[in-house]
Amino acid sequence: GCGYGRNLFEIFYGGGPREAKYIGGEFTKSGVEIAQKLAKKAPKMKTEFFHFNHLEPKLPFKKPFKRAFVFTCHSIEQVMQINENWFDEVVKAGEFVRGAHLEPFGFQLKNSGPLSDMHKDFMIQNSWNINFAEVLRQALERKIIKDEQIFLEMGVTPDVNVGSLA
């Protein structure tokens, strides 16, 4: 999830659109509560924070926005297997939806050598995500989404948790 909304606040204060509504879904009650408290300190920023579960994805909106940008950043990683309808639900955010998912899934698509092996072992050892690439592939096949580009293994963290972008 979005945690306490750090990425949303950084985008807004880093020059993000002032007219946009910044919406964050977070699994933990404490994360949602902290994000809501921080949002009160940012009165010029339009925000909404809600409970979101990657295992049972549901968006709380009554109707879709005209345009939506949906992104995840090392959020899905902590859910061993996301629901196969994850993308089906997320595209309901808007009439036109652009997505960007910086998640550690590169090893699921291609073995690039020792780093991929270490990363896969790390993910399995921690019971972290092992099906993002498959759910993405199925959503592409069903034409729920269309892929423009995938960038594998873009950065390395000290614990070999390498992010890829879809």
Protein language model regions, located:
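Conserved Class I S-adenosyl-L-methionine
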Residues: 114-141
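A short, conserved alpha-helix within the catalytic core of class I
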Residues: 78-90
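Class I SAM-dependent methyltransferase SAM/SAH-binding core
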Residues: 6-56
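Short conserved loop adjoining the S-adenosyl-L-methionine
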Residues: 56-64
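A conserved beta-strand element that flanks and buttresses the S-adenosyl-L-methionine
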Residues: 70-71
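Core SAM-dependent methyltransferase catalytic element
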Residues: 152-166
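Conserved glycine-rich SAM-binding loop
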Residues: 3
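Conserved beta-strand signature within the Rossmann-like core of class I S-adenosyl-L-methionine
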Residues: 96-107
